[in-house]
Amino acid sequence: MRNTIGVIGLGVMGSNIALNMASKGEQVAVYNYTRDLTDQLVQKTGGQTVKPYYELEDFVQSLEKPRKIFLMVTAGKPVDSVIDSLVPLLEEGDVIMDGGNSHYEDTERRYDSLKAKGIGYLGIGISGGEVGALKGPSIMPGGDRDVYEKAAPILTKIAAQVEGDPCCVYIGPKGAGHFVKMVHNGIEYADMQLIAEAYTFLREKLLLPIDEIADIFDTWNQGELKSYLIEITAEILRKKDERTGAPLIDVILDKTGQKGTGKWTSLQAIDNGIPSSIITESLFARYLSSLKDERTAAENVLAGPETEERPLDQNVWIDRVRQALYMGKVCAYAQGFAQYKMTSDLNGWHLPLKDIALIFRGGCIIRAQFLNLISEVYDKQPDLSNLLVAPDFAEKLKEYQSGLRKVVCEGISSGISFPCLSTALSYYDGYRTGRSNANLLQAQANYFGAHTYERTDMEGVFHTDWY
């Protein structure tokens, strides 16, 4: 009996994907360019149907036709290298699937090259981390629909399940699947930073004990803020350091990095004139955090505001922070889904925004309760430009904007940095401003650079002689 699927790349994610497939009844062939990872996986299987191969040709020949090969290798040149090695061994109609974090434009290049050879190619976004890979991730496949249909029975089996539905849906042509995963990661960056800023207010402004803050996040996770990231934040805050007994959060260095997909999201938005400001600010917050030595030195040089300490009603302010966080998250998701919509329109992808929201509900890092509402909005208004103007969200933001404004103002007056909460507020106010100050920018550009401008009272382009 031939193997039904092959997995190449047996790091943590690849191994767990292979184990996931095996647990769902697939006959899985596995291959890694180094033998040790293959041997480690075999030791874990406990009799599951994972069969190791140590020669690529043997691996390929073991697969039933049309062959389906799932790549879980490092994005970039390693993917090209593996594909180059596979192509001479494959036949027309075989399918290669890239489940790594490849840039969607690389996926489109590979798709074009392989299609010319008669080989199907799917760029598959996978979210959920190592646990999701093993127990069921959110899966975002892009490529030709007929090629997807060949792999769909396996992909839908290994995906997370929510209310009986798999968190896997055909996204669109060519690089659409990896594009959706890329922006997902940008939303994830923003979501994480917004939560960090809410935590900062509770701890530094309200001076709440860390265990009490954990309880607050637990409470929030029972309501409209219910999400994976809120849930794990409560767990993180309760964790004690085994060496010191202190809260682990207090001994973790405040310096973080990024793996590239967040940056790609911002660059793609910039290239296409899409205002993904909250997502981009969350990236810049990470860059600023990496300047640890500079920040430590600046702390002793740069003055903050002189403020009079005044008592704050904790219950009132805790609820304001909740409102601020909810509104910030809605604005961040609105930016991400607007980026989906605008890019889909530019490329003719027809991204299924309703379904994208649904498959984000399980397995993935940004799974959240309000994704149900986002899906309902796009079900009613599939061509909606921005979630902010959907009646259900607009009414909630009308109610919650006061909380966000008060939290941002209190933070600013206290010298606390709230890059994403303040940017969310600016985005909200900017988006609801029918007549902006961009007319002055146009006049300035015309003054010094002879750039033309349009008028409000007649059609055409104009230039003024300012001198």
UniProtKB/Swiss-Prot annotation:
Pathway: Carbohydrate degradation; pentose phosphate pathway; D-ribulose 5-phosphate from D-glucose 6-phosphate (oxidative stage): step 3/3. PROSITE patterns: 6PGD. Substrate binds at N101, S127, G128, G129, H184, N185, Y189, K259, R286, H451. It catalyses: 6-phospho-D-gluconate + NADP(+) = D-ribulose 5-phosphate + CO2 + NADPH. Its EC number is 1.1.1.44. Keywords: Gluconate utilization, NADP, Oxidoreductase, Pentose shunt. It holds the Pfam family 6PGD. The active site is at K181, E188. It is an enzyme of class 1 (oxidoreductase). The keyword Iron does not apply. GO terms for molecular function: NADP binding; phosphogluconate dehydrogenase (decarboxylating) activity. NADP(+) binds at G9, L10, G11, V12, M13, G14, N32, Y33, T34, V73, T74, A75, N101. GO terms for biological process: D-gluconate metabolic process; organic acid catabolic process; pentose-phosphate shunt. Catalyzes the oxidative decarboxylation of 6-phosphogluconate to ribulose 5-phosphate and CO(2), with concomitant reduction of NADP to NADPH. Belongs to the 6-phosphogluconate dehydrogenase family. This is 6-phosphogluconate dehydrogenase, decarboxylating.
